Regions:
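Serine-esterase "nucleophile elbow" of acetyl-processing enzymes
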Residues: 29-87
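Active-site segments of SGNH/GDSL-like serine hydrolases
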Residues: 125-129, 157-194
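Bacterial N-terminal signal peptides that target proteins for export
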Residues: 1-11
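Structural recognition of the beta-strand scaffold that forms the well-ordered cores
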Residues: 39-44, 48, 82-87, 120-125, ...
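Oxyanion-hole/transition-state-stabilizing segment in secreted/luminal serine hydrolases
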Residues: 97-147
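Catalytic His-Asp segment of secreted/periplasmic serine-dependent ester chemistry enzymes
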Residues: 176-255
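Long, low-complexity serine/threonine/glycine- and acidic-rich segments characteristic of extracellular
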Residues: 257-349
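Bacterial N-terminal signal peptides
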Residues: 10-20
Length: 350
């Protein structure tokens, strides 16, 4: 009987002790759901297919953009970013509207919707072959081709938007670089005709609420560096990296500036007039440039040294006449976001 009584007392004490805890307990808050699978759909021609890069499925611009999206969205809880690249080398706007690429894109969008995925981005690189097939044509033929493009390119964008339905995907179209690097203001020149087609692309994008990665002005002056021209018309690895950067900026997902810290020199008197400038600059997606400015004037780009994990340079102030200076370091990331840091220094022997 004593044992029974003791057991009852222990049970009563435990129940009494736990009662206040139960009274104070609150319902569990459900964990916020992660982002669904993010889908990136790449459409277009041989540029979008990554043709003539060293590794098309690694260095082609859609794969580079996918990698950037993955860095960005996985940090927000997305399980993955899936790239579906339907680009067809040789595709024109006319063949796009009538061929398999658009049909397959529609099926991809429906499949994503059915499995609960989100088509987050669509890139469209179309029109290059519409331009190329008119090479060597007379003015009347080129005008007829341009008039047709004014119908087919907007129709292609409208078909993509219709397929997306209520899915709020971001559409980015790319313009085309001018291999001649001529004067686009010179009516009738190759550069002028390329500019006319690019203007159709820009205007059509505006009408459909799409964004523009404006390749042409950025490639101007860099054709031999960023393409295989004159042996081939396609962009090389460096060119695709530049297109990817422009697309990433146009998408506008990354609004976070990099972090910048000046490690050397410290504020105050300098030990010599050729100080080493050492900077840490970090970004979740990537830093593209770190500049040194002195009293607001650009001096040089600092160079990243992997073994140091820092950006380094030397400021040559031997001819600097003022007793002091403000050193500003400005870092830019892939999305174009910028951040800066400053340090005030006094020069010796002033």
């Amino acid at each position: 009987m004593r044992r029974t009584r003791s057991a009852l007392m222990v049970a009563l004490l435990i129940a009494t002790a736990l009662a206040p805890l139960a009274a104070r307990s609150t319902p569990r808050v459900a964990a916020q759901p992660a982002l669904p699978e993010q889908v990136y759909l790449a459409l277009g021609d041989s540029i979008a297919a990554g043709l003539v890069t060293s590794l098309p499925r690694v260095r082609g611009y859609p794969w580079l953009v996918r990698d950037l999206m993955e860095k960005h969205f996985t940090s927000e809880g997305a399980p993955a970013v899936t790239l579906i690249n339907r680009a067809v080398p040789g595709e024109t706007t006319t063949s796009f509207l009538a061929g398999d690429q658009l049909r397959e894109a529609r099926a991809d969008i429906e499949a994503a919707r059915a499995r609960g995925a989100e088509v987050r981005a669509v890139t469209v690189t179309l029109g290059g072959n519409d331009i190329l097939r008119l090479a060597g044509s007379d003015e009347a033929e080129r005008q007829a081709g341009l008039d047709q493009f004014r119908t087919t390119f907007p129709a292609a964008l409208a078909a993509i938007r219709e397929a997306l339905g209520e899915m709020p995907a971001d559409i980015v179209v790319t313009t085309y670089y001018d291999l001649s690097e001529g004067n686009p203001a010179e009516q009738g020149s190759d550069a002028w005709w390329v500019a006319q087609f690019n203007e159709v692309i820009r205007q059509s994008a505006a009408a459909e609420g799409a964004r523009v990665a404006d390749v042409e002005p950025v490639f101007r002056g860099n054709i031999r560096e960023w393409t295989w021209y004159p042996s081939d018309i396609h962009a090389n690895n460096a060119g695709h990296a530049e297109i990817a950067r422009l697309v990433w900026q146009a998408l506008g997902y990354d609004q976070e500036p990099p972090t910048v810290t000046i490690e050397r020199p410290a504020a105050g008197p300098l030990g010599r007039r050729t100080p080493t400038v050492r900077v840490r600059a970090d970004d979740a997606v990537g830093v593209t440039r770190v500049e040194l400015l002195v009293d607001g004037t650009y001096v040089q780009d600092l160079r990243y040294i992997p073994s140091q994990g820092a950006y380094l340079g030397v400021w040559d102030a031997r001819d600097w006449s003022d007793a002091s200076a403000t050193l500003t370091v400005r870092a830019t990331d892939l999305a174009g976001n910028q951040a800066s840091a400053e340090v005030e220094v006094a020069l010796p022997g002033s």
